[in-house]
């Protein structure tokens, strides 16, 4: 219930602060008016009968203004500091009470199931935040791997395949999904989808474990692909597309594949809808979920998306001649400026994919069951992001961030802060601000390898998102110093050597490779959270590892502690 009231609480905060600002502006105007009138009166009195009486009147007015300003300062403090803290404390208290009630001895004695979909009290206030200051970020190290039971099932035959994990975590619970193919990993005709939800609990050793409370296996003949998942109040929401042909054929077509939203609640209610967002048909040749997780934001569920835009459509024309070159390129690329600009502009268009413009964006859906025409597509401006690719959305406090897979020519981790504009209660536009970094590279072939630093056309890379440990907005220049953690494939051209790391804008601070040299791997997802009891920060690194026994890949969750050295 608390999670469901989050949008209302956020709206009340905005209304309260807006009213406060209007009140303060009125007070300021009145104060200026009173001061102006008092000066005129003072002049008149001094010219007529001296200044004794006017000084008394002016002193009275000054005292009145001081009282007004004192009240105004108290209002500012209450609205900006005290009220948000009280709301956070109240939320934590309510969640703790609900957790305690649903696991009480009385319920257990009455044979009631005591498992609530709420994380342990130690973690509720330690989720979706920045965990270290800028100074602390310079001295972080990775702890050893912690042994926990895996909440991710693997293939059970040598021919089976589990791929494309997506994981989402909020204060209350987590949601997870991956694709299951019965024979090999290359299949655009038939697959199933595994979904689970659960909570974080402490082990007797003191570190966290992930307890699964509900699972769902979608095996109904619908070939859902590239699914992106998000936690929502009381359950999970998932965005998938239905694949019926190879990826290249999707881009060459003129109508996008079927788009689906699935809502799964903890009480076993399942709602699935085929969605038709306005502005997609006849504009997008194909539209795919970003595979990385989405977020629940102000009553809307936001998912990363990307696809191919048809030539001469309104979106195509609006993005014409737009390009983005990351800040770090200037000092690292030997091309002259004109060549960089020309190559950067052409990098958004793929001849392999029928000369479509490869575009990134956000799918925004209200949290309701009738979603057929309610979801919206919000494209990023291509002078703020690179060529369209898989991605992930994050919540850090009240801020939304975006990871974009480095499919294009710049091989480094691409993170952005996202601003969402609302019009008449609906998200209407998005903008992105890049966190400048020259770490951490992904592998690629030819001119698109991990060593490339100059603009050009690339369609390479691998999904490897990262978690920000420090706030990029904490520096005078946005993102000039930021620390983040994740996993990457430590090779220039091959998908090998999975390595967990902590890095900043310019260097890798700490790293640990998993397995022997040459170990094959693929996608990597990273999420961090804090145990507010011990104040320790943990990160879960979900990595696709190649397997010679069961399936081509096994999806494995690794947990490490991030510590100050």
Swiss-Prot record:
GO biological process, one term: virion attachment to host cell
One Gene Ontology cellular component: virion membrane
EC numbers on record: 3.2.1.18
Single GO MF descriptor: exo-alpha-sialidase activity
Residue spans, topological domain Virion surface: 42-565
Membrane topology: Single-pass type II membrane protein
Keyword vocabulary terms for this entry: Disulfide bond, Glycoprotein, Hemagglutinin, Host cell membrane, Host membrane, Host-virus interaction, Hydrolase, Membrane, Signal-anchor, Transmembrane, Transmembrane helix, Viral attachment to host cell, Viral envelope protein, Virion, Virus entry into host cell
Domain notes: The C-terminus (head domain) is involved in binding the cellular receptor.
Name the UniProt record assigns to this protein: Hemagglutinin-neuraminidase
Gene: HN
């Amino acid at each position: 219930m608390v999670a469901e009231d989050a949008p209302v609480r956020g709206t009340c905060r905005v209304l309260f602060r807006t009213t406060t600002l209007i009140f303060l502006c009125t007070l300021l105007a009145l104060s200026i008016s009173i001061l102006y009138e008092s000066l005129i009166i003072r002049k008149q009195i001094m010219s007529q009968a001296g200044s004794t009486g006017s000084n008394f009147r002016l002193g009275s007015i000054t005292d009145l203004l001081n009282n007004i300003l004192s009240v105004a300062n108290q209002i500012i403090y209450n609205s900006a500091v005290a009220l948000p803290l009280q709301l956070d404390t109240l939320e934590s208290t309510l969640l703790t009470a609900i957790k305690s009630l649903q696991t009480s001895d009385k319920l257990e004695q009455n044979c009631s199931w005591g498992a609530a979909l709420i994380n342990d009290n130690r973690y509720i206030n330690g989720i979706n935040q920045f965990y270290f200051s800028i100074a602390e970020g310079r001295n972080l190290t990775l702890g050893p791997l912690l042994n926990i039971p895996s909440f991710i099932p693997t293939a059970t035959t040598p021919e089976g395949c589990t791929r494309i994990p997506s994981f989402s975590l909020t204060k209350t619970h987590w949601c997870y999904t991956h694709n299951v193919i019965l024979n090999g990993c290359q299949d655009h005709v038939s697959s199933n989808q595994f979904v689970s939800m659960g909570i974080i609990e402490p082990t007797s050793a003191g570190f966290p474990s992930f307890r699964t409370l509900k699972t769902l296996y979608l095996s109904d003949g619908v070939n859902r692909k590239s699914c992106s998942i998000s936690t929502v109040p009381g359950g999970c929401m998932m965005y998938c597309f239905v694949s019926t042909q190879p990826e290249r054929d999707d881009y060459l077509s003129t109508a996008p594949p079927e788009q689906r939203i699935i809502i799964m609640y903890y009480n076993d209610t399942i709602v699935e809808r085929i969605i038709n967002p306005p502005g997609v048909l006849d504009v997008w040749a194909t539209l795919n979920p970003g595979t990385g997780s989405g977020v629940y934001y102000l009553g809307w569920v936001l998912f990363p998306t990307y696809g191919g835009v048809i030539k001469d459509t309104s979106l195509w024309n609006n993005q014409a001649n737009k390009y983005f070159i990351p800040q770090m390129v200037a000092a690292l690329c030997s091309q002259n400026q004109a060549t960089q600009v020309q190559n950067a502009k052409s990098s958004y268009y793929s001849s392999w994919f029928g000369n479509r413009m490869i575009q990134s964006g956000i799918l925004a859906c209200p949290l309701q069951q009738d979603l057929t025409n309610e979801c919206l597509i919000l494209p990023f401006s291509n002078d703020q992001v690179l060529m369209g690719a898989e991605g992930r959305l994050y919540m850090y406090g009240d801020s939304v961030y975006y990871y974009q897979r480095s499919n294009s020519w710049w091989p480094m981790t691409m993170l952005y802060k996202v601003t969402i504009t609302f019009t008449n209660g609906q998200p209407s536009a998005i903008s992105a601000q890049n966190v400048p970094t020259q770490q951490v590279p992904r592998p690629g072939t030819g001119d698109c390898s991990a060593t490339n630093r100059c603009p050009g056309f690339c369609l390479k890379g691998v999904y490897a998102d990262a978690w920000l440990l420090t706030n990029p907005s904490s520096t005078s220049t946005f993102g000039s110093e930021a620390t983040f953690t994740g996993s990457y494939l430590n090779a220039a051209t091959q998908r090998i050597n999975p390595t967990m790391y902590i890095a900043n804008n310019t260097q890798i601070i700490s790293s640990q490779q998993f397995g022997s040299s040459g170990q094959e791997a693929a996608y990597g997802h990273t999420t961090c959270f804090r145990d507010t009891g011990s104040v320790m920060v943990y990160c879960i690194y979900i990595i696709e590892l190649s397997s010679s026994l069961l399936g081509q890949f096994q999806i494995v969750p690794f947990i490490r502690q991030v510590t100050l050295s």
